[in-house]
Every structure is written in C-alpha cells, then in structure tokens.
C-alpha cells in the first residue's frame, strides 16, 4: 500500500489531503453549530422563565463554554424581543405602557381653550342683528305668488300623472305610480309652505292694525294699553289672532267651513281627554275587571 502511495505524484497526494482536511473541519463545525444552537435555546428558555417569575429548571451554564462569541449572539438575539415585550401589557385591564426611550413633548396644555367655531357672517346674529319680519315680508313679497304658481302647476301635473297611471300598460304601472306619489309629496310640501306664508301674513296684518288703532287712541288722550302675550286664557293676542283666523275662513269657505273646523277641534280635544283618563269609561276602579262576562 505504501508502495502504491509512493508511486503517486505529489499533486494528487496534495489534493487528497486537502479534501480530507475539509471534510473533517466541516463535520467538527456542524457538531459545534448544533451544540451552540442547543445552548442558545436553553438560555432563552431560562430567561423567559425568569421574566415570568417561575423557577429556572433549565441550566444555562452550557452557554459559557463557547466563549464570548456565543454570549454576543445570545445578547443580540434577545435584545429585540425583550424591548418589545417590555411595552406589552400583562392583561387587557392593565394601563398602557410606553417606552422610556421616546422623548416627551415639552408642550403642555395648562388651560383648555375652546375651539373657535367658523360662522357665516350672512347668517350670524352678531353681524346681522335682529331680523325685521315686516321688512323681510316686504322685500320678498313676490314669494307667495311664486308658491301659488308652483302649486297650480303641480296640481295639473298630478292630475296628468293620475290619468297616465290609469291608462298605462301593466309593465309601466310601478313607474307611473312612483312618479305620481313623488308629485303628490312635492305638492303637499308646497301647500304647507303656502298655508304657513298666508297665515303669517294674516297675523302680521292683524297685529299691525291693532297697533295702529292703539296709537290713534293715544292721540285722542286715552291711557296706554299693552297687549298680553303668551298661552294663557286671558291672552289678548291669542284671542285676536283666533278671531281673525275664523273671519278669514268664513270669507273663504263660509260658515260651513267654520263649523267643520270647530267640530274637528272639539273631536281632537275629546280624544286627548279620553287618553288622559286614569281608567276607561264605565269602570269603577283601576283594580276591577272591566270585561263583560257571559251569564249562564
């Protein structure tokens, strides 16, 4: 065998020696790396148990036999999770934890200043002042006429929509019905605006007439008289407006319209009175049974 080795050239022997040394070094490094990984895992487990306050059952003395290199790698690997776990809460009821490395702002809010609200100067009470209802009604006196024109146009449109809904094919029925309902809702809104506008105009006219009469009486030497305001039964303003309302209604629809309004008001008050009763009509008390029983 030795004779065979002596017959080989030196270059071949050098290559063989190099390959053998490489295999031996790789096997030793693999074994060492496995031992280092095991030691690191043991040290991490021991550190986690210490942080939770449990008894350390895994010895971490194996990590010292590999020198400072293993210790440095252990510290580098543990530095990341340790900083993140320090800011975590132990439970959901615990207060939030903040890192001490974060710089605190030097700004302090000593007095809470209310946040300024942006206002439109056109509609602000500070710049616009009090609105004059008489001046507003005179400036926009054309609005009631526009509302009447719009109401008459919508009335005609509703009549045409009803006719189209009645004569349309079955497939177009839902579309025609929706269009008719939309026009009716719009007409109701315009009617409400028109009635409110006419009522306000009537009230302003009645109050202006009463003030004019009072000024004339003062010029004749009579004492000053001020109209009582409010919702009391002795309120002159309420009585005056109610009387003017009935007079206007009588001019428009006659005495029949006034009777209908009075009857409607009476029924409304009667229903309110019935609802406010402590027990039903004919019952003698709250505890008794008011149902009729069949007599055998």
Swiss-Prot record:
Residues 15-135, 253-296 are annotated as: Disordered. InterPro entries: RRP36 (IPR009292). Residues 147-203 form a coiled coil. Its main location: nucleus. It is found in: Nucleus, Nucleolus. Keywords: Coiled coil, Nucleus, Ribonucleoprotein, Ribosome biogenesis, rRNA processing. Residues 18-31 have a biased composition (Low complexity). One of its GO terms (cellular component) is nucleolus. Pfam families: RRP36. Component of the 90S pre-ribosome involved in the maturation of rRNAs. Required for early cleavages of the pre-RNAs in the 40S ribosomal subunit maturation pathway. Belongs to the RRP36 family. Associates with 90S and pre-40S pre-ribosomal particles. This is rRNA biogenesis protein RRP36. It comes from Cryptococcus neoformans var. neoformans serotype D (strain B-3501A) (Filobasidiella neoformans).
């Amino acid at each position: 065998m030795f004779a065979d080795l002596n017959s080989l050239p030196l270059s071949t022997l050098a290559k063989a020696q190099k390959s053998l040394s490489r295999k031996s070094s790789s096997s030793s490094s693999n074994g060492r790396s496995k031992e280092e990984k095991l030691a690191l895992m043991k040290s991490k487990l021991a550190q986690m148990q210490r942080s939770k306050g449990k008894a350390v059952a895994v010895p971490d003395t194996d990590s010292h036999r590999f020198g400072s290199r293993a210790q440095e790698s252990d510290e580098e690997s543990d530095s990341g999770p340790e900083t993140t776990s320090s800011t975590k809460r132990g439970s959901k009821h615990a207060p939030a934890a903040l890192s001490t490395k974060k710089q605190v702002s030097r700004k302090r809010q000593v007095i809470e200043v209310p946040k300024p609200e942006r206002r439109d100067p056109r509609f602000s009470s500070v710049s616009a002042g009090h609105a004059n209802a008489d001046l507003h009604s005179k400036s926009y006196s054309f609005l009631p006429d526009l509302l009447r024109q719009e109401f008459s146009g919508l009335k005609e449109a509703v009549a045409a929509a009803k006719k189209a809904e009645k004569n349309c094919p079955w497939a177009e029925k839902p579309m025609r019905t929706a269009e008719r309902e939309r026009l009716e809702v719009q007409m109701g809104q315009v009617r409400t605006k028109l009635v409110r506008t006419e009522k306000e105009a009537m009230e302003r006219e009645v109050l202006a007439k009463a003030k004019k009469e009072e000024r004339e009486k003062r010029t004749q030497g009579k004492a000053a008289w001020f109209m009582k305001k409010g919702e009391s039964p002795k309120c002159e303003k309420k009585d005056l407006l109610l009387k003017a309302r009935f007079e206007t209604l009588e001019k428009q629809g006659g005495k029949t319209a006034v009777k209908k309004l009075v009857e409607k008001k009476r029924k409304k008050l009667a229903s309110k009175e019935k609802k406010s009763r402590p027990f039903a009509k004919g019952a003698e008390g709250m505890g008794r049974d008011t149902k009729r029983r069949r007599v055998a």
